[in-house]
Design a protein with these regions (language model features):
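An alpha-helical, amphipathic repeat domain used for nucleic-acid recognition
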Residues: 1-197
Length: 197
């Protein structure tokens, strides 16, 4: 939970008012607990420009979703106000775009032989509805090949090493996000090809 500086100051001052005279140091400085409160305030950065700079540095490495960027800024102790302002600015500039992120994410996962179910699940983690992306999944599957071909290619590239090849291959495909029907068809085809060799 991020803490607002004004909130902390108001609540700490309100709590300290009755005892503030008794807790004043001999030299007239602030009470020790207020000094600790100011240190806590320094942990949270309320500078929207600094948060925007952080977004620029993050996006220089790779494209990110709005949700991923927000959680990174929260982890780096920016206040909600700074996060909201910097995200709004990044969206306005076109630095952040969930549709663009999702399209690249889908293509990358399909090239890595991941299944549609796994891609949908991963995009939900970014708070993106995969089916709201234009052309999903058909347009992307046309570019990368069918799910069945991708599943077979995955098994050929990284065959299971267990004794029960059929069960291990099926489990591998399910873990990689393929539907059960695609996984079972791919395993049958893959086993048949191996027996022919």
């Amino acid at each position: 939970m991020l803490i607002d500086k004004d909130y902390i100051q108001k609540n700490l001052l309100r709590e300290q008012e009755p005892s503030s005279l008794s807790s004043m140091a001999l030299d007239g400085s602030a009470p020790a607990c207020l000094a600790h409160a100011n240190e806590a305030l320094d942990e949270y950065n309320d500078n929207a420009n600094a948060a925007f700079g952080k977004i620029e540095r993050l996006l220089a490495v790779r494209d990110r979703s709005v949700t991923e960027t927000r959680s990174r800024l929260q982890r780096d102790h920016y206040t909600e106000r700074a996060i909201a302002e910097s995200l709004e600015r990044a969206l306005h500039c076109g630095y952040l775009d969930d549709v663009r992120f999702a399209e690249g994410f889908i293509r990358m996962r399909l090239r890595a032989s991941k299944g549609i179910n796994g891609i949908v699940r991963d995009l939900k983690g970014h708070q993106i509805d995969a089916y709201a992306i234009p052309g999903f999944p058909d347009a992307f599957l046309e570019e990368q090949g069918s799910q069945l071909d991708n599943a077979i290619r995955l098994l050929e590239r990284k065959p299971p090493r267990a004794k029960n090849k059929k069960q291990a291959a099926y489990a591998k495909l399910i873990r990689n996000g393929f539907s059960s029907s695609v996984a079972s068809s791919a395993v049958k085809t893959w086993i048949a090809e191996r027996e022919d060799q």
